[in-house]
Amino acid sequence: MVVGAFPMAKLLYLGIRQVSKPLANRIKEAARRSEFFKTYICLPPAQLYHWVEMRAKMRLMGFNAETIKPLNEEAAAELGAELLGEATIFLVACGCLVLEYSRQKTQQRRKEGEQLAAWDAMRDEVDHLALVLEALQAQVQAAPPPGALEELQAQMREVRAQLCVQDLPPAPQEEPTPRDEGPPDPGLGQD
C-alpha cells in the first residue's frame, strides 16, 4: 500500500504545481516590473540564497571563502523572482495540505460524534431494559410461589367439586324389590 502511495503523492504534487504555476508567473512578472517589489522583496532573499549556496559549495570543495561577491542586480532580480515563484507554489501546496488535514479532522470529529450518539442511544436502551428487567423481577417476586399456586388450584377444584355436588338434584332412592330381599329361591319359576 505504501508503494502505491508514492506515485499518487508525486502526481498530487505535480497537479498542485501546475495549478499554482500561473499564479507564480504573475507574481514573477509583477516583481520584474515593480522597482519597490524588486528592491525590497526579490533582491534580499536572492542575495542571501546566493551567499548560502556559494559558502556551502566552497566548503564542500575545501576552500575557505571569506568574502563572496554578490550577484548583479539583474541576476539577483531574476533569482529572487524564481524564489518567489517557488515559494508561492510551496505555499499553495502547504495550503492544500492544511485544508486536507482540516477536512479530515472535521470528518473524524463528525464520525466520532455519530459514534458517541450511537453509544448514548445504546446506553439509554440498556438503561431502559434494566428498568424493565427490574420491574419484571419485582412482578415475579410479588407472584405467589409455584407451590402456593398448585395449592390454590387444588382448593379451587375442591370448591368446584363441592359446588357441583350441591347443584345436582338428589337422586331418587329405589325401593327394594322382592328379588332384592333375599337370596333367590331355586325352586321358583321352574315349572
From Swiss-Prot:
It comes from the Eukaryota. Residues 120-143 form a coiled coil. Its main location: mitochondrion. One of its GO terms (biological process) is regulation of lipid metabolic process. The keyword Mitochondrion applies. InterPro entries: OPA3-like. GO terms for cellular component: mitochondrion. It is found in: Mitochondrion. Keywords: Coiled coil, Mitochondrion. PANTHER family: OPTIC ATROPHY 3 PROTEIN, OPTIC ATROPHY 3 PROTEIN OPA3. This is Optic atrophy 3 protein homolog. May play some role in mitochondrial processes. The keyword Mitochondrion applies. Residues 163-191 are annotated as: Disordered. Belongs to the OPA3 family.
